[in-house]
């Protein structure tokens, strides 16, 4: 299938990515100096805090208002899939565990979970969109490029659209980041700055992506009249 072909191509790219990252970082540092590497910690904190707030505010709100269940019930039910996603950095690899948690812990039917969760693992990438937006701003600041309000809005739109087409495999978000940077006229070499910490960022965004899939499945189940577990 087309999806499997894309996964294999992505895997091939990621195998040689470290060599390309080293070369890009060498060029960037030689041109702009070591000071350009200093804000990495801020990027990591921004992505992790953003993901945490998204889960605690958006997902908790949806579960409470629509599914009529407590956030503690939800996060307790999906903690295994969240941990697996954090470790594997792959929505696709986590999918079997996500489906099992949805059925056994949340009480979502096979009919809904087997449709919503695989679809979500393909197109529902909240964490990836957040990550791409933060990284685009980081690249702009690192290169001293001012962004107008329109450019920032363009980043939000492009990051959202690019995340929908991101494969659920480790490192795929970094490849799609090039589209976001190109769309707003930022230097594509900025990907090298992000690549050095991408594995750390990938853990958080994949965890949020998978959690969002389970949240949507819970909401769909509730709106379809199913009785969720307590």
Predicted regions, residues:
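Transmembrane alpha-helical segments and their short flanking loops
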Residues: 133-230
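Membrane-interfacial loop-to-helix junctions in multi-pass transporters
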Residues: 11-15, 49-50, 64-74, 106-113, ...
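Transmembrane helical cores of multi-pass ion-transport proteins
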Residues: 13-23, 91, 220-230
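Membrane-embedded alpha-helical segments of transport systems
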Residues: 16-19, 50, 120-131, 197-212
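Hydrophobic alpha-helical segments of integral membrane proteins
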Residues: 1-13, 33, 37-44, 74-78, ...
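Signature of multi-pass transmembrane helix bundles
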Residues: 1-73
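Small-residue-enriched core segments of transmembrane alpha-helices in multipass membrane transport
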Residues: 3, 41-58, 77-83, 153-164, ...
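Helix-loop-helix junctions within the multi-pass membrane cores of secondary transporters/permeases
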Residues: 80-163, 217, 228-230
